[in-house]
Amino acid sequence: LAKDTRKLFDPKDDAVLTYLDDDGRSIEPEFYMPTLPTVLVNGTEGIGTGFSCYVPPFNPEDIKQNIVNHINNKPFKPMKPWFRGFKGRVFEDEGGGWVTEGIWQVIGTTVKVSELPPGRWTQDYKEYLDTLVEKKLIGSFTNNSTTEDVDFLIQGYSGKDIIKDLKLQKTIRSTNMHLFHPSKGICKYQSAEEILSDFIGLRLEYYKKRKDQLIW
């Protein structure tokens, strides 16, 4: 385990978790109860029986501040998706979704791309640019990217819509956030703030269980 894992999964919760049984042997808990909702910190994506889910990651500092706001009877501040190390923009579109946008610079017919939207990898992007060379939408390109930085120099671009042609934006929809709640079952959430609200309610239940255990 990473050294900070036990800050997220407090040892004081161990005694109040419900542990599963495997042939008379106690194994892992039915679910863990972290101090921050890891589904919002890490994001998640998957397909289950009859349901699919996509939740983007959010900034742990924003999540923490909204928990403090709740404790102080203040409203949540809207949170936007956040990707560690991403240097581009994240903004809300007119349909209520989110758009991630890379970074580029245009000099005549040359385009320097120094950041791609999250989830768009440099190898895949290189292969995509190869198809644009075949279509004669660009003349050539050089890939100087490293494991740390994106660096594509695209020459001879002749298109009309640089963002669409060079795939410099990616849309994130928040209409498919299906998650399993321990007492409610499968729930469809409309926002990250709604997920956080349910988490806080459950987290408070477990603080109460810890308190009751100390008393009794």
At which residue positions do the language-model features occur?
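Generic, well-ordered alpha-helical scaffold segments in large soluble proteins
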Residues: 3-8, 39, 54, 63-70, ...
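Short beta-strand elements
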Residues: 5, 37-42, 97-106
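Long insertion/accessory domains within large nucleic-acid-processing enzymes
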Residues: 18, 22-56, 61, 65-68, ...
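Active-site-proximal segment of RNA-dependent polymerases
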Residues: 12-39, 76-98
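A short, contiguous, amphipathic alpha-helix enriched in charged residues
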Residues: 1-27, 113-137
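Charged, surface-exposed alpha-helical interface/stalk elements
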Residues: 73-216
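Conserved glycine-bearing catalytic or ligand-binding loops at nucleotide- and phosphate-handling centers
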Residues: 1-4, 47-100
